[in-house]
């Protein structure tokens, strides 16, 4: 019995699970500093992320020979590095696996690069689903719990 005590203590000290699917309000709060970046509203971003990943930070989608990762569905063809697509341009200079956690700061930095280079229509859901009638994407819960995002704002330079 005594040899199981350390294992038991280790298990209860770890979180039971890591959340990967978030609510509209959690995502909206976590990315609120993106509001207005390159003229894109928070409501547009909230809508795009719903239609892109379903607010799932661990979403992985195979698409035309490449793979898209995380909440923003960032492609390994151009933006991040993965072993399955070694010829990637890796414009964001990051491993694609970094987009599969709940730490969104690196996802946001890369998303800002994508928007600066390609525009919001890089995310195919934007034009048909997120360019008008956006009130449904408003979050009415003040103080919704934030995902792990260090202080960023729309003025944060994109490296």
UniProtKB/Swiss-Prot annotation:
Function: Regulatory subunit of lactose synthase, changes the substrate specificity of galactosyltransferase in the mammary gland making glucose a good acceptor substrate for this enzyme. This enables LS to synthesize lactose, the major carbohydrate component of milk. In other tissues, galactosyltransferase transfers galactose onto the N-acetylglucosamine of the oligosaccharide chains in glycoproteins.
Keyword Glycoprotein: yes
Assembly with partners or alone: Lactose synthase (LS) is a heterodimer of a catalytic component, beta1,4-galactosyltransferase (beta4Gal-T1) and a regulatory component, alpha-lactalbumin (LA).
Cystine pairs: 25-139, 47-130, 80-96, 92-110
Family: Belongs to the glycosyl hydrolase 22 family.
An annotated Gene Ontology molecular function: calcium ion binding
Domain C-type lysozyme stretches: 20-142
Protein's UniProt name: Alpha-lactalbumin
Tissues in which the protein is found: Mammary gland specific. Secreted in milk.
Primary localisation category: secreted
PROSITE patterns tied to this protein: GLYCOSYL_HYDROL_F22_1 (PS00128), GLYCOSYL_HYDROL_F22_2 (PS51348)
Sites carrying sugar chains: 64
Residues annotated as signal peptide: 1-19
Coiled coil regions in record: none
GO biological process, one term: lactose biosynthetic process
Residues given in the record as Ca(2+) binding sites: 98, 101, 106-107
Keywords, ordered alphabetically: Calcium, Disulfide bond, Glycoprotein, Lactose biosynthesis, Metal-binding, Milk protein, Secreted, Signal
Cellular localisation: Secreted
GO cellular component, one term: extracellular region
Gene that produces this protein: Lalba
SUPFAM superfamilies named among the record's database cross-references: Lysozyme-like
């Amino acid at each position: 019995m005594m040899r199981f005590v350390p294992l038991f203590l280790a298990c209860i000290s770890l979180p039971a699970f890591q959340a990967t699917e978030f609510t509209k309000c959690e995502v909206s709060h976590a990315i609120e500093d993106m509001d207005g970046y390159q003229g894109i509203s928070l409501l547009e971003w909230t809508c795009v992320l719903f239609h892109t990943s379903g607010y799932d930070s661990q979403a992985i989608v195979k698409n035309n020979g490449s793979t898209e990762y995380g909440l923003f569905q960032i492609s390994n063809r151009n933006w991040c590095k993965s072993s399955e697509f070694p010829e990637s341009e890796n414009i964001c200079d990051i491993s694609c696996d970094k987009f599969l956690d709940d730490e969104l700061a690196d996802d946001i930095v890369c998303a800002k690069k994508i928007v600066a280079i390609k525009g919001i229509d890089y995310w195919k859901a934007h034009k048909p689903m997120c360019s008008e009638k956006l009130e449904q994407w408003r979050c009415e819960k003040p103080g919704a719990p934030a995902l792990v995002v260090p202080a960023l704002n729309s003025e944060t330079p994109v490296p």
